Amino acid sequence: MLDIQFIREHPEVVKESQRKRGESVELVDEVLRADEERRSSLKQFEEARARQKEIGKQVAKAAPDEKAKLIAQTKELSEQVASFKASADTADEQYTTAMWQLSNIVEPQAPEGGEDDYVVMRKVGQIRDFAAEGFEPKDHLTLGEEVAGIDMKRGVKVSGSRFYFLRGDVARLQIAMLTMAVDQAQEHGFILAITPTLVRPEVMRGTGFLNSHADEIYRLREPDDDYLVGTSEVALAGMHENEILDLSDGPLRYCGWSSCYRREAGAAGKDTSGIIRVHQFDKVEMFVYAKPENSDAEHQKLLAMEEEMLAKVEVPYRVIDTAAGDLGSSAARKFDCEAWVPTQGRYRELTSTSNCTQYQARRLNIRERVADGGTSPVATLNGTLATTRWLVAILENHQQADGSIEIPKAMRPYMGGKEVIEPRKWEA
């Protein structure tokens, strides 16, 4: 949620942000109209209530011949108070509805445009020339099947499309990757949290995911009302809902480990083979509460953490600055790290890190104590540190001519010292 005082004073800034996102500019005027109506209705209610109280005091002191008149006025005012209260409640509801529809203000540095208008900030690593090595690379699913590590057929049999089993060394590879991510996060002062994967509607709404991503989210049927999370960001944001945090010693940093669930409602026909786009996956997510003035610097730290992990798994990647029209409603700015996938001949997203400024904190009422003794919303940030999709890039970029997969050096201690995953027959 945005600061209404800022909207009143700088409506053109908010309108420009909405324009860059490709969202309704008129919504800003709707918010301002609703705000004016809310304040006007509330003022009428408060004035009528004050008159009602004053006359109530006069009734107690009035002479018998005046008391009847005052009581009649009190009854008339009671009806007015009730009417003004109803108007104020309606106006406040309209204001709240409009305010919650507004997306975060895009940072000026974010590129303009849509999904394809990102800016490449840098490319890191050498793309392998498989032709020079004398063999055609296999895709991650073929490799996973040949080492008896990815079983899509049985995943579909058990749960439907876009489900899978990870088995054997590929399952261990995922655990190794996620554990390595946790170790790295803890070395940098992050607190490990294994988070709930079901959250209340208020928490899902507070993080902004019901604005632009509602169709991607699984929801339980009645009588239950919870949502399945697509990232532990949601639970980590909700963890400090309605709290006042002490950030005097620096940001509060978490890394959350959880299973994640996404409907992929808009992905019909996309990435139907393999584990690039699936309904369930595991992820280690970084989440930070920081002072607003420190959020940009903290954003760069999260990006550096992601690049540190990518260096450990030894895959070529690029960093992009996401365009305003491709930002989620909560993000003011977002950087993605995309790894090279040899068989697709293109980069695919592995991580994203977003600076959500004070947007989520206002919606969830998460504040810090400030110098004058009052409170102010904190800034929140998030970033992916490892997830199931990384296996795609690891398998394809580390494959050998004989179908084996060389395990990245940094991951070997987490694999019991194993250096290579060899092709093998399915045991069952």
Curated annotation (Swiss-Prot):
InterPro entries in UniProt: aa-tRNA-synt_IIb, aa-tRNA-synth_II, aa-tRNA-synth_II/BPL/LPL, Ser-tRNA-ligase_type_1, Ser-tRNA-synth_1_N, SerRS_1_N_sf, SerRS_core, tRNA-bd_arm
Reaction it catalyzes: tRNA(Ser) + L-serine + ATP = L-seryl-tRNA(Ser) + AMP + diphosphate + H(+); tRNA(Sec) + L-serine + ATP = L-seryl-tRNA(Sec) + AMP + diphosphate + H(+)
CDD domains cross-referenced by the UniProt entry: SerRS_core
Compartments (UniProt record): Cytoplasm
A biological process from GO: selenocysteine biosynthetic process
Residue numbers binding ATP: R262, R263, E264, V278, E349, L350, T351, S352
Gene Ontology molecular function terms on file: ATP binding; serine-tRNA ligase activity
UniProt keyword annotations, A-Z: Aminoacyl-tRNA synthetase, ATP-binding, Cytoplasm, Ligase, Nucleotide-binding, Protein biosynthesis
Subunit details: Homodimer. The tRNA molecule binds across the dimer.
Role: Catalyzes the attachment of serine to tRNA(Ser). Is also able to aminoacylate tRNA(Sec) with serine, to form the misacylated tRNA L-seryl-tRNA(Sec), which will be further converted into selenocysteinyl-tRNA(Sec).
Family of the protein in this entry: Belongs to the class-II aminoacyl-tRNA synthetase family. Type-1 seryl-tRNA synthetase subfamily.
Domain characteristics, as noted in the entry: Consists of two distinct domains, a catalytic core and a N-terminal extension that is involved in tRNA binding.
Record-given protein name: Serine--tRNA ligase
Species: Bifidobacterium animalis subsp. lactis (strain AD011)
Lineage, opening ranks: Bacteria, Bacillati, Actinomycetota, Actinomycetes, Bifidobacteriales
